C-alpha cells in the first residue's frame, strides 16, 4: 500500500491487445473468484465498529502469496487488496516494463495459491474461472477503485443485514406497466410524491430554484421520482440522496440481462448502494413492453408536440427505438407513477 498520489495513464486510445501491452507500466484491478463461489477464504463478521473477514488458512495463504509475488516481481506494487469469503481483489501497479506480462504474473500468483491450498489439504479446485481484469485508464478511476476494494466487506455486511433490499424483482407491476426493480418497494405505497424533471437547456439559476422546491417537498415527506437524465436532474437527485431523502429512479437500462451470470451477484454501485442499504432508494427499469404501451406513446407524442410548438416548429414522430423517445418515455412513466 502507498499514500502517494498516483495518476493512472490517460491515453484512452491505447489498446490492451497490442503485443507487449500487458508488460508495460499500467494499473490493473484484478478479481479472482473461488470455485462455485464457495466461502473458501473466510467468514464475514462484525467487530462492533466495522465489518471484517475472518480469514481461513487458505485466506491467509492468499496474503502470503501476495508477498511472494512482490519478491519475484519487484516491478509491481499492490495499491489495494481485499480477501473476501468467496473472492479476492488486488489493485496492481506495474511501475516499469516487466519481462513477463501482468497476466502471467497473476496466473503464477494463482498457481501459488492453489499449491498452498493443496498443502493445507484442500484438493478440490480453488478457482473455476480465469481472473477478471480491469485496466484503469481514466482520471479518478484509481481512487474510486481503491475505495471500492476497501469497502467490500462493509457492503457485503449491509447486503446480509438487508437481503430484501438487494433482491432483484423481474416483474414489478405499477400502473399497468412492468418493471425490473431493486430496493425499498414500500416507497411505491407512499402517497406524497413529486416528479423531478428538468430540461437539458435549464440554466444554473433554474436548477437552483428547482432544487429548493424539491428539497422543501422532500423535507415535508414527499418521495422524489426521477429518471435523472439531464444534468439538472442528476444534480438535484444527488442532493436529495445526500440529504437522506427517499428517491425512486427510473433507469434506461442498467440491470443485467435475465439469466446472465451477472444477475445473481448484481448490486447498485457507488452512493446508490448506501441509499439502497438504508431503504431510501428504489430502482425501476421499465420492461421493453412498457415503452410500447399506448398510454405512454400518446403521452410522449403530446409532450414532444408541445415542445415543438413552443419553439414554433412542426412536430414529427420520432422512432420508438431512439434514445430521445426512451428518455421522454421515462419521464412520462415517472409522471404516471406520481399522479396515480
Regions found by a protein language model. Give the residues of each.
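Short catalytic/metal-binding and nucleic-acid-binding patches
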Residues: 1-177
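Glycine-biased, small-residue-rich flexible motifs in mid-sequence functional cores and linkers
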Residues: 168-340
Amino acid at each position: 500500500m502507498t499514500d502517494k498520489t498516483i495518476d493512472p495513464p490517460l491515453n484512452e486510445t491505447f489498446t490492451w491487445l497490442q503485443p507487449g501491452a500487458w508488460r508495460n507500466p499500467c494499473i490493473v484491478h484484478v478479481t479472482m473468484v473461488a470455485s462455485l463461489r464457495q466461502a473458501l477464504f473466510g467468514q464475514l463478521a462484525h467487530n462492533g465498529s466495522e465489518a471484517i473477514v475472518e480469514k481461513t488458512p487458505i485466506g491467509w495463504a492468499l496474503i502470503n502469496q501476495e508477498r511472494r509475488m512482490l519478491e519475484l516481481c519487484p516491478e509491481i506494487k499492490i495499491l489495494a487488496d481485499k480477501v473476501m469469503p468467496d473472492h479476492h481483489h488486488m489493485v496492481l501497479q506495474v511501475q516499469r516494463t516487466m519481462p513477463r506480462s501482468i497476466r502471467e504474473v497473476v496466473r503464477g500468483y494463482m498457481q501459488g495459491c492453489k499449491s498452498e491450498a493443496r498443502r493445507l489439504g484442500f484438493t478440490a479446485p480453488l478457482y473455476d474461472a480465469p481472473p477478471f481484469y480491469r485496466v484503469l485508464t481514466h482520471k479518478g478511476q484509481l481512487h474510486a477503485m481503491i475505495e471500492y476494494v476497501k469497502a467490500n466487506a462493509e457492503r457485503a455486511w449491509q447486503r446480509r443485514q438487508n437481503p430484501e433490499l438487494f433482491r432483484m424483482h423481474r416483474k414489478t407491476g405499477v400502473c399497468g406497466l412492468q418493471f425490473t426493480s431493486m430496493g425499498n418497494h414500500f416507497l411505491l405505497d407512499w402517497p406524497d410524491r413529486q416528479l423531478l424533471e428538468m430540461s437539458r437547456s435549464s440554466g444554473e439559476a433554474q436548477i437552483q430554484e428547482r432544487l429548493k422546491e424539491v428539497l422543501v417537498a422532500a423535507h415535508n415527506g414527499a418521495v422524489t421520482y426521477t429518471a435523472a437524465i439531464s444534468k439538472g436532474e442528476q444534480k438535484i437527485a444527488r442532493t436529495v440522496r445526500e440529504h437522506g431523502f427517499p428517491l425512486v429512479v427510473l433507469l434506461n437500462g442498467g440491470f443485467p440481462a435475465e439469466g446472465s451470470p451477472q444477475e445473481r451477484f448484481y448490486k447498485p454501485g457507488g452512493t446508490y448502494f448506501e441509499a439502497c442499504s438504508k431503504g431510501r432508494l428504489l430502482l425501476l427499469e421499465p420492461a421493453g413492453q412498457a415503452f410500447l404501451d399506448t398510454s405512454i406513446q400518446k403521452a410522449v407524442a403530446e409532450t414532444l408536440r408541445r415542445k415543438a410548438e413552443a419553439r414554433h416548429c412542426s412536430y414529427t414522430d420520432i422512432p420508438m427505438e431512439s434514445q430521445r423517445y426512451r428518455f421522454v418515455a421515462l419521464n412520462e412513466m415517472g409522471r404516471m407513477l406520481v399522479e396515480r
